[in-house]
Amino acid sequence: MRFWFVLLALLGKEIYAYENERNALNATAANKVCGLSTYLKGIAHRVNSESAVVTEKLSDLKMRSIQLQLSVMRNRVPSGEQDCKDIRTLLKTVLRNEFTFQQELEEMRNASALAAAAAGIAAGRLEEWIFVFAQAAGGSSQFCISVGTNIPAEYNNLQECFDGTIGPETLYKIEDSRVKESAQKSLQLHEVLSSISFSSLGAESIVEKGENRGCNLMRTADGGLLKDVCLNRNFTWGGGVLNFGYCVAGNLKIKGGEYGDVGSHDAVRWTEDPSKVSIFKDVIRLFARFQEVKNAVVKKIKTTVDELTKCIGQKEAELTNDQLYEEFEVIQKYLWFL
């Protein structure tokens, strides 16, 4: 009789532990999420710098146009160039293109603003998630981000997230050097997104299992996010990165999948394909649109500059921008008085 009593007591203890374990997020995954957030913030710098390059190319086109006009006025257009025979048509085309390029440049700037905004929103969603988890820490073994010991993760364990003691003021800002450096990396958006996929991280780098850390933020059953009930719908962190069924009791059995793959009340899914996560879809679409518009404008400007360059006289080609403006103004004044 005593044997069965002890066995039942042990079984009861195991069941109780299973139902009430509140796992913590692994600091490895938290740092990866923050690294992605930093990269997304860097997109704002990237689109701005690439837009500035296109603006410079358009300015160069205008200078080439002035060089050509000076060459025509001084009768110094290279006579051997077949493409320079109909110089009047070429000039008309250039002037018409300059107006078109200004409109396309404005379209590119609008596209860059939308891409930067989408990236900023996505970065904010990720940052808020990790910030909430990092702050959810008690003085003992109760916390929501784990480094595998009985103490919570501190800022030195989350250096991809915080530039000092955990707090809102130490989150990396868009003007910080780390963000600017991220913008200069040659990594493509899809590469950075894939770094947080389930297959890239693995379950052991996402959730600390087998320990009760008291983190109610990863529990949707009663005694979790709400006091005495399960939720009435599925739940997500990071806009679709970490997804929970509506009644997850703890001891997470995490698998790869998306928010729409959470088919049972106790399922937990970490994104397998970040390009399907809602907050990243706009970034992918709008950044691709910016690149498309930018590349089209750059190609047209280059073609026009190449056509102009063949017909510019050697002396005009050697003039600095200041010299060009000065001589062009002199000739315009002379023509005005004729």
UniProtKB/Swiss-Prot annotation:
A biological process term (GO) from this entry: symbiont-mediated evasion of host immune response
Main location: membrane
Pfam families documented for this protein: Trypan_glycop (PF00913)
Sugar-bearing residue positions: 26, 110, 234
Subcellular location: Cell membrane; Flagellar pocket
Leader peptide range in chain numbering: 1-17
Subunit structure: Heterodimer composed of ESAG6 and ESAG7.
Name of protein: Transferrin receptor subunit ESAG7
Gene name linked to the record: ESAG7
